[in-house]
């Protein structure tokens, strides 16, 4: 089983599962499908079930198989083969599953949790780390075992990681909206390439959209909207004592009409922590270092 090396939409800091030929035929349409027959071995009695905050989910069975990503191989990786997925996953033909790069404590396989891909291969790497360089409107890449200095500018700002919950979780100590002054406030955050938007505390989101002409919270759309023509300020998170900035144009996420757009920054209500998803990460070179553990951010070149 060999996914493309630069399959940014399929690699996530969260869980690992794939579309498989064990799903209903209607759900397989338009997707790359995992067939365990050539080399996979069924782990009898092992199942998994994942539900996400947006109501989507998937469930299935488990195989042991050889998995290679970007030249790195796990010889007996637990592959969570979907037997059923929610309609939102079935209709998204840009997504054929998720590759887990988090800590194995987050794994949902029963009766015994399985190692994530990264935990399976990290002992074979020169350094037990990987980096993510996601791009806006262009293919991104992941590197395993080394840091490519040609992909970022300036220094890498590191913050300690709390891995107790299985996430790459760290503390941001403040933020900056546009060219304004830094606001010191600590909040717990995770970096997750499997999440599209940024989800932040209410006070920070309100502070940001107060600087966007015509912005308002819409109960109809369940988030902040604004005139598409509005100038969008940048947003910087203070991480490891340094500001790491996402351009305002990235936060103008998607049109919902010919004149109105939906914001890439929304409330983290009910989540319990901040999530820096792709809207933020596509401006950053991110180092996930399991040796300490720690996470590092630098501005992309």
Which residues does each predicted region cover?
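Pepsin-like aspartyl protease folds
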Residues: 1, 35, 40-61, 87-88, ...
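Signature of the N-terminal lobe/flap region of pepsin-like aspartyl proteases
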Residues: 1-83, 211, 236
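Active-site beta-strand/loop microenvironment that shapes enzyme catalytic pockets
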Residues: 5-7, 180-208
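Aspartyl protease catalytic domain
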Residues: 68, 75-184, 260-266
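Aspartic protease catalytic domain
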Residues: 84-85, 234-301
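Conserved beta-strand elements of beta-rich interaction domains across eukaryotes
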Residues: 86, 104-106, 137, 147-149, ...
């Amino acid at each position: 089983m060999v996914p493309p090396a630069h399959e940014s939409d399929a690699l996530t800091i969260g869980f690992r599962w794939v579309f498989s030929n064990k799903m209903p035929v209607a759900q397989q349409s338009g997707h790359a499908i995992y067939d365990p027959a050539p080399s996979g071995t069924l782990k009898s009695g092992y199942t998994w079930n994942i539900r996400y905050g947006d109501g989507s989910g998937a469930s299935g069975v488990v195989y042991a198989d050889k998995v290679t990503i970007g030249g790195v191989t796990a010889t007996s990786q637990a592959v969570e083969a979907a037997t059923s997925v929610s309609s939102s996953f079935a209709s998204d033909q840009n997504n054929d599953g998720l590759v887990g790069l988090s800590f194995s404590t987050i794994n949902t396989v029963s009766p015994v949790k399985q190692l994530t891909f990264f935990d399976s291969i990290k002992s074979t790497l020169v350094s037990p780390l990987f980096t993510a360089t996601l791009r806006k409107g262009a293919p991104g890449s992941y590197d395993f075992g080394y840091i490519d200095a040609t992909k970022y500018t300036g220094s890498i700002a590191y913050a300690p990681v709390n891995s107790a919950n299985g996430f790459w979780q760290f503390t941001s100590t403040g933020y900056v909206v546009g060219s304004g002054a830094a606001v010191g406030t600590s909040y717990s955050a995770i970096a997750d390439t499997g999440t599209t938007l940024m989800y932040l505390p209410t006070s920070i989101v309100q502070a940001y959209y107060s600087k966007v002409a015509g912005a308002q919270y819409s109960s109809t759309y369940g988030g902040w909207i604004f005139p598409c023509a509005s100038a969008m300020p940048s947003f910087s998170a203070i991480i490891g004592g340094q500001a790491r900035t996402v351009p305002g144009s990235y936060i103008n996420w998607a049109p919902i009409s010919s004149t109105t757009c939906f914001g890439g920054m929304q409330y983290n209500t009910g989540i319990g922590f901040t999530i820096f998803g792709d809207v933020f990460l596509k401006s950053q070179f991110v180092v996930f270092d399991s040796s300490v553990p720690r996470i590092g951010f630098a501005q992309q070149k």
